[in-house]
Amino acid sequence: MSEPRYESWGRPARTARRAIAGCDLPRLLPAEVQGRAGGGDGTFLPFGNGRSYGDSCHDDAGTLIDSRPGARIHAFDPQTGVLTADAGVLFSQITRHVAPAGWFLAVTPGTQFITLGGAIANDIHGKNHHRRGTFGAWVESIVLDRSDAERLHCSRDAHPELFAATISGMGLTGLIREATIRLLKVPSLTIAETTTRFDNLADYFELAEAADERHEYAVAWIDSLATGRALGRGHLIAGDHAPEGERTGIARAPLASVPITPPISPLRGLALRAFNEAYYRKARPGTTQRLVPFDQFFYPLDRVGRWNR
């Protein structure tokens, strides 16, 4: 039985859970899972890197199967951008592996510290949803272990119904052992960022439609506390891969880490209102453009360790 706590990023319940390494299981047999976990009710659920919100990957009476130990990238074709890796490989590992060859994840969420299996199980979306769809559209095949069958190789041609159900299946269709995905060809990882400050919700909708047409990536921050004429004010941030720039795929180290869980959240009431006001005015009126590192554009919160506290 493992010592670390296995919990979701939103931390809805913090209790110790049984967990074993998936690499220790040659086959997904309930009796073997129970024996290695030292108990449990016979149920088991895959666990990625604990970056999901809500109560995903909570199986208090059963056993979690940790997909990270021993996870590695098996193959990458720099000509076609097709990669095969274990489910426990992190997006950060994939980026470092493929960026020098001019490739990037076709869909990525707001953190690089998710697993490949977790991305499939949640069918994640990113800032380019309007162009690339969800992550599942880029999955070519899945190697799936089930307790009631032999290991299955699933794709749009082989076991298509199970393949479709596993994408966004939250781990309930079986244990994803590995997956093959397609990547996005990019000139660099540096992002040409365009930020437009808007005064109200009506302005946002007009800007957002234009941004989706012109840019690969688009996302907005809205001041949810603003009222009256300022209702819905915020920033629209759009981006595209710069023609020249960084291609190492190495993100910067965190600036700081939250050491403790405060008894009361500091982001509430007047403090949150003051933060929103300052953040809104951080962007100059009108539109500004600049070049930014990929991790600053895609993963700004990754620079604050344990910010979920």
Language model features with spans:
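Noncatalytic alpha-helical scaffold of FAD-dependent oxidoreductases
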Residues: 1-309
